Amino acid sequence: MTISRIPARDQAHKMGVLVGNPGGPGGDALGLFSWAAPPAAVQDRFDLVAVQPRGLVGGTALKCAKFNAANDFVAVTNYGAINRDRCEAASPGYPATLTTENAARDIEMARHALGVNKLSLYGISYGTTLMATYATLFPQHTDRLVLDSAVNPNGIWNRVGSDQTPGYKGRVNAMMAWIAAHDNLYHLGATPLAVYCKWSARVEKEAGVPPSLAAPPAQVGDVPPGLKAWSQQYIAGVNLTADARARYENFVATMLTPGGDQSKSAMLTATRTVAPDRNYWPLIALRLSNMVPRRKAVKPTPDEVAAETASNNMQTILMCNENQYPAQPAQIPAALFANLVVSDVFEAPGLFWESGIACAGTTPRVRPVVTSNRGLAVTPLLINSVDDPQTPYRGAMVLRRAMGAHLITVGGGDHGQLARGNRPLDAAISQYLITGRTAVTAAPQAPITTPLNRLPTTSGSSSERFGYGW
């Protein structure tokens, strides 16, 4: 087990230790507070600590043999068992220990190693599940607890992905609207639909087929000049058929185009990846408008490949180990179609889990800890944006009720609110961590801090993983 620590800048007035987790399952925790620094007041008063989750590089990496299925039918009907067996073969006895509860108990071991009586906790995304679990198991050792972008405990784990799908599509529409609002800079169109048309053409150029994602709603500005007298009828017809047209056109093209596969489009996969983070939206616009030269994607190093492999293996094993949401076998045809026929990057992940394919042939090893605020001395703080696609607001309220948390509702739809330069929210987070309370209940969405007209100068951007060498 590896622990990282950044000492409090004002040791004379240090209040304690703040342990953070960035999410996942499978997120690398060790560098969290380096790339997502808390507000200055928190850096002054707390040692910033991260405990690498078990299963990852730095946390005894899970090793797995190569995935090998006799045929596609066996892979679909026994996917979870094959996956578990291949990891068991390479790491005997270890896969069964990969659970959120054990990760929480590892944090408790870290507390002993640090020699402190209480920990303050900051969890983002899946980190909210982990930190709420720790607080439930060890309330006597829990001080402040911040739950940033909270996972719905009732969806663990088969339902989580499908709950995200509508939000991801909605955030892409919001991205198109944002680009259209900056048409003076990007010249991609003055309406979301106009931007989408250029985006769709780029996807088709890269993949050989158009995307199956429906276009944003048409507006008056999208009506052809000759049809202005029938604007409302035109708009209604376009919007009513948008989803069906996109799916049909993608399917026909996929069937007729050798090698046509929308998931081969770097623009499409990057758009889906960055939808929950407005700081990356300018990068999509810059690439789409050809305002910046395309750079060759950076080839990952062997260490990066090892870390990514361990992360993916750990995530799947952990989720199947503690899966509680019933599988929906009726969704198997839709899951196979989305994953194997049209490669729908928006719908495929959720359907893969909801249908039960991801854990097929296995049963859960444990029941997740039922989280609660029993015994906590300080009321937890929960933060969520209203349109967060990755941890939808409605689901986050389930964890809020379970933990009796004070809620700060953030505007917009960014996922993860730490280190976004949101001054009102940062002040509230600092106030809570230092005093144990805050009266703030709402905050605006964070500003976009990425340059709008050029690529960031920082090297090693995570955007390099999205298919373009940004």
Q: Which ranges hold each PLM region?
A:
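Conserved acidic catalytic loop of the alpha/beta-hydrolase fold
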Residues: 93, 101-118
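Short beta-strand/loop motif that positions the catalytic acidic residue
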Residues: 375-376, 381-384
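Conserved alpha/beta-hydrolase "acid-adjacent" motif
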Residues: 389-394
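N-terminal cap/lid subdomain of alpha/beta-hydrolase-fold enzymes
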Residues: 1-77, 386, 398
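A catalytic-pocket lid/entrance helix-loop region that shapes and gates access to the active site
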Residues: 69, 135-198
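Glycine-rich nucleophile elbow surrounding the catalytic serine of serine-hydrolase chemistry
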Residues: 28, 105, 123-135
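Catalytic histidine-centered segment of alpha/beta-hydrolase-like enzymes
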Residues: 413-426
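Alpha/beta-hydrolase fold active-site neighborhood
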Residues: 199-374, 469
